[in-house]
Amino acid sequence: MKLGFIGTGEISKAVIQGIISSKIKFSKIYISNRNNKISKQLSKSNKKISIIKDNQKIIDACEWVFLAITPAVGKKIIKELKFKKKHTIISFISTIKMKELKKFIKVKAAIVRAIPLPPISLKKGPIPIYPPNKKVKRFFNNLGTTVEIKNEALSLNFWTTSSMMAPFYEILYTLSQWLIKKGVKKESAQKYITSLFVALSEDSFNKSSDLKKLVKESQTPKGLNEQSVKELRKLGFYRDLNKTAESVLRRLKKAK
C-alpha cells in the first residue's frame, strides 16, 4: 500500500507517526513539503517516507490520498488535482463537506471524511469517519478506535467536540501555571497536572456508562470537589462551554 499526504501539519505528522508504529502494511508514504520543517523530520524518521513537492505527483504515485490542508487551501487546490477511481481519498478538512469534496474531486472514487486528533500518534483515541467504509475502518482501527457515522449532519457534532482539544490543554496550562505561581517547580507542576488528568480520563473511560454519576461520586458533602463544581456552575463555566459548542456547530453548518 502506498499512501500520500497533501499537507504536512501537526495532524499529518501525528497520523504518520501512528502508521509507522502500527501493524499497517505500507510500502511507501509520500508527503508534500507544505511545512518544510515537519516534512524533513518525517522523511528522516523512516526510509519509507519521501517528500514530493508536486501534489499531483503524490496522487499519481499512491492508492490512498490524505487531504490534510486548511479549508481555504483545500478549496483552492483540490479542484486542480486529478484523481482516479482507484483512489481512496480521506479528508481531514473540517469545513469542506462531502458534496463539495465530490464536486472538486470529480471522479467516483471512495471519499471519506475523518477526524483524527494528535493522540493518534500513540494509536489512541477515537477516529470518527463519514460515511462508513470497511477498508477505512480497518485502517484506522490500527490507530485508535474508529467511529462510523452514517449521517453527515450528525458528524458535525463530532467535529464540534473535537474543537475542545485546545480548551482542554488551556485548562491544563492554567492549572499548572497556578501551581507554579504558588512556588511549585514547572516540571513538577506540569507532571502532576497532566498525570492527574490522564488518570481521571482513564477512570471516566472505564466507567463511561454514566458520566453524570461520576460527577456525583467524585464529590463529598461540603468537600473541595463539591465547592469547585458549584462555584464553576455559578460562574457559568459549563453553560459557556455549551454556548461555545453551539457556536462552533453553527459555523460548521454554514460551511458549504
Regions flagged by a language model, labelled:
Residues M1, S27, I49-S50, H87-T88, ...:
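A structural micro-motif
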Residues M1-K53, K57, W178-K181:
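NAD(P)+-binding Rossmann beta1-loop-alpha1 motif at the extreme N-terminus of oxidoreductases
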Residues G4, K23, K82-F83, F104-I105, ...:
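Solvent-exposed alpha-helices and their adjacent loops that cap or buttress functional pockets
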Residues S12, S39, C62, G74, ...:
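A general structural signal for well-ordered alpha-helical segments in protein cores
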Residues V15, I38, S45, D54-I129:
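Rossmann-like NAD(P)(H) cofactor-binding subdomain of soluble oxidoreductases
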Residues I29, S39, I58, G74, ...:
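Small-residue helix-packing motif on alpha-helices
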Residues E100-A110, G125-W159, S163-K207, S247-A255:
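Internal alpha-helical scaffold of NAD(P)-dependent oxidoreductase catalytic cores
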Residues T194, V198-K256:
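NAD(P)-dependent Rossmann-like dehydrogenase/reductase catalytic/cofactor-binding core
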